């Protein structure tokens, strides 16, 4: 086999000594069948890694393949059956990312509550203002709803339930919506300090933004959820 093409935004792609590459070995471009996986050395002839950072500081790379020769011995799994393996791994990865995102949401809520207890305006702590208390209750509820969906998705995937994929899609939709709500409120309630490098609020927000776009954003997972649930 000879691989040509490019894989973009590969996490730690420039640091790996081997990469598993999906390539079409049969079928049409949009077919699920016909995708095969190959284990390719990162230093193989024709492989180029273009390294860069995302806005949250994570290192990724674009991997360019030009006439990269691979043998049948380098194939992972059955010929043309790679799509199912990819889907399985991505579901597990989405759970891991959601757990990380949930931890960030918890920290943003906790740090915001603590800040409003110490930041004073008009001679009193801003956390005593009922309007701000309501907003912090809303973000707490958003966090709890996301946590419940994470637990549900973990159970569904672990038990190989029929609706496991639907549960993961629902989780990613909630993570996107609740995450945006929580980091937006955290930044606003911290004021201008919320976007400075001195505080970790902005760093958490940027990481949460990247988590919410990795392996599909909320709109993508909403469409996938609808297709599985209602079609």
Residue ranges of model-derived segments:
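Alpha-helical interface subdomain recognition
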Residues: 1, 88-231
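Solvent-exposed alpha-helices and their adjacent loops that cap or buttress functional pockets
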Residues: 1-2, 11-15, 27-32, 53-58, ...
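A short core secondary-structure module
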Residues: 4-48
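Residue-level signal for inorganic ion chemistry
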Residues: 5, 38, 63-65, 105, ...
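A generic structural signal for well-ordered coil/turn residues at beta-strand boundaries
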Residues: 15-17, 31-34, 43, 59-64, ...
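Short, glycine- and charge-enriched coil/turn segments that flank and shape catalytic ligand pockets
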Residues: 27-33, 71-79, 158-163
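Flexible, small-/acidic-enriched active-site or ligand-binding loops
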Residues: 41-71
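A short, charged helix-loop
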Residues: 61-89
């Amino acid at each position: 086999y000879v691989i040509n093409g490019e894989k973009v935004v590969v996490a730690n792609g420039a640091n790996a000594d081997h990469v598993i590459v999906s390539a079409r070995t049969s079928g049409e471009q949009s077919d699920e069948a016909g995708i095969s996986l190959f284990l390719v050395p990162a230093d193989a002839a024709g492989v180029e890694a273009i390294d860069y950072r995302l806005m949250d500081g994570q290192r990724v790379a674009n991997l360019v393949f030009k006439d990269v020769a691979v043998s049948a011995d380098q194939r992972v799994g059955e010929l043309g059956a790679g799509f199912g393996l990819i889907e399985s791994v991505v579901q597990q990865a989405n759970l891991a990312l959601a757990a990380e995102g949930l931890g960030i949401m918890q920290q943003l809520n906790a740090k915001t509550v603590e800040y409003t207890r110490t930041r004073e305006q008009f001679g009193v702590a801003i956390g005593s203002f009922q309007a701000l208390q309501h907003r912090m209750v809303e973000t707490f509820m958003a966090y709890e709803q996301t946590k419940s969906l994470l637990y549900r998705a973990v159970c569904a995937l672990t038990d190989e339930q029929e609706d496991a994929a639907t549960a993961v899609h629902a989780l990613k939709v909630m993570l996107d919506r609740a995450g945006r709500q929580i980091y937006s409120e955290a930044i606003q309630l911290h004021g201008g300090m919320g976007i400075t490098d001195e505080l970790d609020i902005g760093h958490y927000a940027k990481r949460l933004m990247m988590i919410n776009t990795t392996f599909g954003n909320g709109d993508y997972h909403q469409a996938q959820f609808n297709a599985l649930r209602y079609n």
